Every structure is written in structure tokens, then in C-alpha cells.
Amino acid sequence: MHSTLHNQIAAAAKQTKADLVIQNGKIVNVFTREIIEGDLAIVEGMIVGIGRYEGEKTIDAEGRYICPGLIDGHVHIESSMVPPSEFARVVLPHGVTTVIADPHEIANVAGVCGIQFMLDEAKRTPLDVYMMLPSCVPAASFERAGAVLSAAELAPFFNDERVLGLAEVMDYPSLREQHPSMLDKLALAANANRLIDGHLAGLDADAVNVYRSARIHTDHECVTPDEALERVRRGMYVLIRQGSVAKDLKKLLPAIHEHNARRFLFCTDDKHLDDLWFEGSVDHNVRLAIQAGLDPLLAIQMATLNAAECYRLPTKGAVAPGYDADFLFVDDLETLNITHVFKAGRLVAQHGQTVFPAERSAESLEQPLLHSIRCQAVDETDLRIPMKRGTKAHVIEIIPNHLHTNHLITDVDVQEGAFCPSIERDLLKLVVVERHRGLGIGLGIVRGFGFKAGAIASSIAHDSHHIIAAGTNDRDLTAAIEQLRQQHGGLAVIKDGAVLASLPLEIGGLMTRKDYTEVLSGLKQIDKALKAIGANGSFNPFITLSFLALPVIPELKLTDQGLFDVNKWEFIPVEAV
């Protein structure tokens, strides 16, 4: 440490040459939101000066802008379907040099083993992966996940410097009623002087007071400007989300003004690999914000300095002395065209491709991570939804590109005393199969997929990650579920009993050890198959499907135990009285 500090101070004082000097660049100063000029001197991965410097090596920025590396403030890496080592190869070319990850997807399947897997995998990449420990495994007290994590099981992870705090507290009833297990986790984080993230989906100002009283300081679930302002006024940071399903950015931008802008940052939350590759990570958030009229320097500040300060990362988020040499070369601030990405002063990506060798995931994985689909085969008779008193039913209505759903009560087709899917009315059967211990099957009705044939199934079903399937007929539904059993999880599209496309995800039914290029190819085949059964392409059916089982986001969801009214916080029958 002393030798590093000595070398850095000596170079800053121009007593010795810097390791690297970046010349002819326009530095984006996120403290003052201005462009400044000068050489950038770097020693042992840290910026030591801006001015006139000599270096052992020089790089000509050729007049480009030099921006801080971008920070994704909240992401579930598992949603990319690849582990951190491959995830990094996709997001680094997009200028993302730091992420704040919540590994609660794999934790819901494999418990502490899943968290440790993600921490170990994160060491295989130059990307800085910080973790927030899952606070709600399972997501709600009645959920039957693959694990239940207590404060005692989480405590040892706080010894890892990459663990910044407690991840999104989404079980509001347990928080409001001061459930002992919830208080234990909050106290664990507070006593360790760590941060606590929130999850205030659909909650009002009174609930914000409850969250703030619990020392919870962020929310990424705002969908209206009023919600965002309620949180900021009470001292929270608001993460503006733009993911594969939840696309809240344009709606929230009106909440930002000169006096409150430092309380906003960006996140992706959940984003599929193909969306990350072709569209981008939080660089996409920045571009959208600029296109919508936000000052480019403010948008960059939100994606860098604001995020670093929110998560107490004092050496991240700026191009300035004393900060890590994580920076980007950008051709144009309006389009944020990123040409080069540097991590700790080393080039890691250039013109959309990484320039460091890939490191494969560990070949040997612990048993809880493999063969995690443990349910029995499902028969068509298991999928019968009785309708004994008429044709009225409670129906989940999808809102395209939103996590929320509508709760409908509508007429459905009934044959021989049971619900019959209707392609004409876009009323399909929805199935959730408990996959960790084979405990049961939940059945419901969903509107909005628009399929004309077939069925789809996935072992990605937030947050307990049971098998979830939607389809036009029972034959294809059972075939889709069986395909996932055989391939140990993943995605499948079925038509007329045949597999049109599938993507095995052998790590907990959530991720694969395959190269990201193979996953992109597999997702392309999935998209082709979805079109063959009638998907119109206006939203991602699989990501939408994956959130239909999450009973902490309103209004109506389906779990393995049945239909759940989130607003009333109770299970209800499918048939409406």
C-alpha cells in the first residue's frame, strides 16, 4: 500500500513519470458539469492528475470526450442468463465498468451456495461487481422457494468488501408489521454500517415513511413522477429503470429538475442478454434521457457520480485525481457513441468488443446449482380449472412492457365444467409448477400474450423460480413443462406437441455455462419460434411471463399455491362468484 501511494503521489507531483498519460481528450467533469482539457495521468490503476504530464506510455484520445465509466445501480445478472464472467463481456463494451448486483434469483434456488457462486464468478472478470445481499428469500413469507435465508446465514458475507449492503426489501407487510426475521436483517445491515435498498412497488407516501424509518434509502420501482418525488422528498435516491420489461425512464424524467437531480441514477434491473447486446445497458438509459431532452452532462452525471455516491463508492464515478481510472472514449455526447473502455487504466473493450481473454465458468458446480428441477411429470388432467358456478373468472391482464398487471373479472369459455382457452378472446391458461420439492401446481387465466397456437414454458419465474407456462391448449402446455424437466430448466416453445425451440439453462435453471454468442444464437431461435405461435413482437413474452409469478408487484399474480391478489394480499379462486 505504501509503495503504491508513494508512486501515485510522486507522479502527481511530477517527480516521476506516470504509468500512462491520455492526451488530446476532452474530459467530462461530472462535479461541475463542464468539459475541461488537459492530460490525464494514471498510476497503478488510479488517476493522479489532470494537466501537463509525462508518461511511460501515452495514448492519443484524438479529440474524443473522456467520460467516467458507467454504473448500473441495480441489476440481477441472472436475468441475462449468463454468469458474471460472461455478463461482463457483454456490458463492458457498452461502457459499464461497475454494477451493483442483487443475486436473489440464484439465491431463491440455491441459497447461500448461489450467492457464493456469484461472488466467485465475479472474480473472473475486470468488471467491478458489487453485491447487495438478498433480503427477501423467499420474496414473501408464504412463497415456497428453493431456500429460506435468515440474517444468520447472510452475516458471513458482510466480511467480503464487495458486499455493500442489503438488497431490495420487497416484503412490505413483513416490514410494516415488524416481523422478527425482517428486523434481524435490517439490524444486521445497520450494525455493519451497510446500505439497504428498497422496493416500493405501488406504495404510497405513508409506506415511504415506513421504509425510510427502517433506514432504507433507494427505490427502483417508481412508475410515475409523483412517486419519484415522494421518495426524493423523504430522502431516498430514485433509480430510473429501463429493462427488458419495465421501461419507466420516459415517464419519470419530468420529475428531475436542477434542485433534485443529484438524487437520481439509472438501473436496468432485469435485462435479457439479447437486449443488453443489441440495445445496451445503462448507456441505453443515458441515450434515451438525452433524446428526451435531458442535458447530456446531467444524464452522464446520473449514470456515474450519482450512482457512486448513492452506493458509497468514493473512488468511482468521476474522471479526477484520486478516482479509479475507469473511463470511456466517446465520439459524441448526444449519441454517446463509445469507442474505447478502460478499466483501472487498461483497455478492456474497443469498438463494441472486449479485448481481454474470456474466462469460462467453473466446470464443477455444487449440486444445488445443477439438476434443480425436481418436480414430477405433469399430466393434462393436472391442468383442469373447474368452473362450477358460471363463466365469470378472475383474469390476469398483461400490461405490455410493465411489471404490473390488471385484475380483470370477465366471462371465459367453459366446456364440461372447466375453463377452455380462447384464441379469439386471447384468454390462455397459465400454469405454475413448484419445482424445488414438487409440492403443487397453481392454475390461472391470462390475457395479453396473443398466441394463436402452442405454449411456452420457463424456469425463470420471479422470484421463487418455479416452472411457469402459458398456452393455448393442455397438450402443448404439458409438453413444454416436460421439456424443461428433461433439460434441467431454461426456455421452451412448443407447437402441436413438438419443440420449436429451446434454450437449456443448467445453472439453477437460470443461467448457462455457454459462451454468450451461443446464448444469443439460441435466443434468436426462440424469437423465431415465438413468431411461429403468434407473438407480435411488441413485448418480450418470456420476460413478461417470468414476472407473472411475483406476488409483490400488483395487481394479480399466480404462484404455485394459486391466484394471488396483491392489493388485498390474499389468495383468491380463479372462478369469480
UniProtKB/Swiss-Prot annotation:
Phosphoprotein found in the keyword field: no
Entry keyword annotation includes Hydrolase: yes
Superkingdom of this protein's organism: Bacteria
The entry's keywords: Hydrolase, Manganese
EC number: 3.5.4.2
Listed CDD domains: AdeC
One function term, GO molecular function aspect: adenine deaminase activity
Cofactor(s) for this UniProt protein: Mn(2+)
SUPFAM superfamilies tied to this protein: Composite domain of metallo-dependent hydrolases (SSF51338), Metallo-dependent hydrolases (SSF51556)
Short name of one Pfam family: Adenine_deam_C
Any one GO biological process: adenine catabolic process
Catalyzed chemical reaction(s): adenine + H2O + H(+) = hypoxanthine + NH4(+)
Family: Belongs to the metallo-dependent hydrolases superfamily. Adenine deaminase family.
HAMAP family: Adenine_deamin (MF_01518)
Protein name: Adenine deaminase
Organism: Geobacillus kaustophilus (strain HTA426)
Organism lineage string: Bacteria, Bacillati, Bacillota, Bacilli, Bacillales
